[in-house]
Amino acid sequence: MNRGRVQLDAAIAYTLREEQARAVHDTKTYYQSHPGGEYLWNAKPRFGKTLSVYDFCKQVDAQTVLIVTNRPAIANSWYSDYVRFLGRESGYLFVSHVDALAGQPHVLDEQGYLDAAAQGEKLYKRIEFVSLQDMKGSKYFGGEYDKLRHLTELNW
């Protein structure tokens, strides 16, 4: 029985819709002309932000990607789109400590990421998904618990 786990042999090819492609293009143009700059997408629900963000990351060859959300429940949609449209063959590994993703076959915790990167000849790129609730509980972000220290040590 599958029990809701995403299982695919290979990533699915996709084509962004016109408004998604325009958003990715505009963001990439801004990114390239404003090193260290910030860009905010104010997109309607069902726009396809997840796939658009993943496409942008691939286009600019982002090495470390941090996805922070105030809704841990959406972790499953970020994860399932990663499996469907990127997968490990993209060169990205999906890293998360969010409880909703525990035990999923393509999700690594920080140590799992380090182990996977150490086994390959190349350093894998990473997409890390965290919730604000987890960050708030971390002593590195004003909380009490010794967790998520690595988030402060990476160049996002």
Residue ranges of predicted features:
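SF2 helicase/translocase NTPase motor core
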Residues: 1-156
